């Protein structure tokens, strides 16, 4: 297969521009990989498709406020977008405008210094005075909602472009498969005997980018920092040993777990594992950790669409997408979801 095989027509009318009125009220398309059978349900009914002994793995990364404008002392306007966290500090920005090392930038009474230019349109910033670059962005910047929403961030996005269990700040895009998780759904899952575990992967802007080459081996995958706690690794091992299923909530969880598969299945390994997930998953990949996937409906030519096709099977996935369009499902970050079993 080629990248062009993952192009499809997504009508603008099927892109959800805003979150649903009530969190968790979206629809859920369920696809059985073994048969290709499709069922239509609700996200709030997820527990009805899981079994006692299954394990749900969530990404607890928190979206940080990441988009603001700053000004040079001469008056030049520079757009800044904070990039995802790698390690301890979050001080890399994507900038639009003209910058050079040593420049000063003013924003909201704060002064940034351009410490270094590290790539096309990417700079390392520092901030004068107390606090960090991340502190300034958290105080004054806007939420970094996806560009395909074609609108500015609004007050509703501060709450709804964030999961209810977000803990670890560092993402500049939400792990959207779990945006519709609610406390009530967690209660229903636990009552059924489904275990819930978490890990952290800080989602980057690369998640929105279409692939611009036509051969998989020509694409350079973006890297995202992740941490999988020891208790989550232990739960995965126990679930597998007892015949349960590991359900990844989202492509971010999938990438982290599959990238760390060697450690997950190393019975002598102890402690948490961290790394930079640069794994590019596309049809032909053999999954080692996950047994089911809860995810959104993805954009054409995106790496997350190819990952989903690798898990579901491309033919079955595109049949499911055609059905979703026919039944008027909403696509992308604020839209409906699919569960692939």
UniProtKB/Swiss-Prot annotation:
Pathway as given in its UniProt record: tRNA modification; tRNA-queuosine biosynthesis
Cell division found in the keyword field: no
GO biological process: queuosine biosynthetic process; tRNA wobble guanine modification
Gene3D superfamilies for the chain: QueA-like (3.40.1780.10)
Catalytic activity of the protein: 7-aminomethyl-7-carbaguanosine(34) in tRNA + S-adenosyl-L-methionine = epoxyqueuosine(34) in tRNA + adenine + L-methionine + 2 H(+)
Disulfide bonds: none
Family: Belongs to the QueA family.
Function: Transfers and isomerizes the ribose moiety from AdoMet to the 7-aminomethyl group of 7-deazaguanine (preQ1-tRNA) to give epoxyqueuosine (oQ-tRNA).
The name this protein goes by in its record: S-adenosylmethionine:tRNA ribosyltransferase-isomerase
Native organism: Chlorobium phaeobacteroides (strain DSM 266 / SMG 266 / 2430)
């Amino acid at each position: 297969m080629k990248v062009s095989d993952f192009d499809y027509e997504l009508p603008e009318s099927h892109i959800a521009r805003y979150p649903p009125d009530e969190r968790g009220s979206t629809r859920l398309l369920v696809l059985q990989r073994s048969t290709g059978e499709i069922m239509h349900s609700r996200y709030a009914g997820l527990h009805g498709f899981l079994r006692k002994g299954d394990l749900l793995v969530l990404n607890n990364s928190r979206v940080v406020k990441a988009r603001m404008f700053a000004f040079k002392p001469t008056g030049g306007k520079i757009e800044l977008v904070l990039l995802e966290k790698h390690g301890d500090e979050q001080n890399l920005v994507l900038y639009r405008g003209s910058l050079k090392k040593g420049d000063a930038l003013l924003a909201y009474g704060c002064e940034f210094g351009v410490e270094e230019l590290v790539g096309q349109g990417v700079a390392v910033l520092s901030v004068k005075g107390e606090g960090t670059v991340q502190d300034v962005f958290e105080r004054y910047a806007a939420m970094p909602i996806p560009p395909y929403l074609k609108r500015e961030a609004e007050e509703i996005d501060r709450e709804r472009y964030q999961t209810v269990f977000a803990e670890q700040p560092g993402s500049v895009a939400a792990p959207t498969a779990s945006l519709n998780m609610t406390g009530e759904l967690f209660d229903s899952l636990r009552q059924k005997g489904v275990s819930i575990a978490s890990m952290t992967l800080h989602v980057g802007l690369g998640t929105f980018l279409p692939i611009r080459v036509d051969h998989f081996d020509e694409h350079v995958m973006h890297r995202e920092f992740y941490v999988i706690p020891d208790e989550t690794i232990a739960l995965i091992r126990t679930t597998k040993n007892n015949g349960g299923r590991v359900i990844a909530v989202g492509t971010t969880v999938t990438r982290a777990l599959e990238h760390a598969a060697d450690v997950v299945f190393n019975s002598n390994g102890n402690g948490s594992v961290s790394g930079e997930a640069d794994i590019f998953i596309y049809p032909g990949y053999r999954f080692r950790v996950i047994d089911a996937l809860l995810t959104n409906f993805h954009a054409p030519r995106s790496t997350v669409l190819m990952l989903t096709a690798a898990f579901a099977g491309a033919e079955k996935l595109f049949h499911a997408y055609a059905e979703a369009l026919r039944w008027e499902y909403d696509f992308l970050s604020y839209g409906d979801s699919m569960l692939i079993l």
